[in-house]
Amino acid sequence: MNTTNYEDIWQASLIHVTDEFALPPVVLQAGEAIIGTLGNFSVSTGKAKAKKTFNVSAIVAAALVNGQVLEYQASFPESKRTILYFDTEQSPYHCQLVMQRILRLAELPIDKEPQNLKFSHLRAIADPNERREIIRYAIYNTPNVGLVVIDGIRDLMLDINNSTEATKLVGDLMQWTSEQNIHIQTEIGRAHV
């Protein structure tokens, strides 16, 4: 028996013209352009070898120092300074190279573990649903998360062309960002778009 009270959900979802809403906290900018707010997600797209990972590395470096790196500016609240980075495509060796690049861009030492960056490689996990559950677990069980990067979001689905799977994945992103008040930065190759 379904016990969901749709009347309560419906009433809670209504927006009134007299309601007051503030712009969600802007946490990532490129120049004057807003590229990230808490409670939302964004997608970097481009062809293979189009420097998507480099740009995301610069964004993460800016978030790591909570300041400017190249053209990116980050301003996360102190309670949202932890960064989770998930790579679904590369080997641990290549993931470590990306992590070192992030640290160099942030002008931080590459021989000392960064306090608020957790970098996870998920390539060896074959089941896309298990990858997704690991990401969900980390988001909900890591203190002070403000930024989550998913490099290779297409690897969280079995079939990129399946609209049901795509809708469920986008629903997860919306739920995670909303419930945890975080920004999720995803990356996908243009061949998958």
Model-derived regions: residue spans:
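The Walker A/P-loop phosphate-binding site
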Residues: N2-I102
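Alpha-helical initiation/capping and key positions within long helical/coiled-coil segments
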Residues: N55, E165-K168
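Conserved inter-motif catalytic segment of the P-loop NTP-binding fold
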Residues: P77-N161, K168, Q175
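Short, well-ordered beta-to-alpha junction loops that form the rim of enzyme active sites
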Residues: K47, I153, G189-R190
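Structural motif
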Residues: V43, L147-D151, Q185
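Substrate-engagement module of ASCE P-loop NTPases
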Residues: N141, T167-R190
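Short, flexible loop motifs at catalytic/binding sites
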Residues: N5, K118, E179-N181
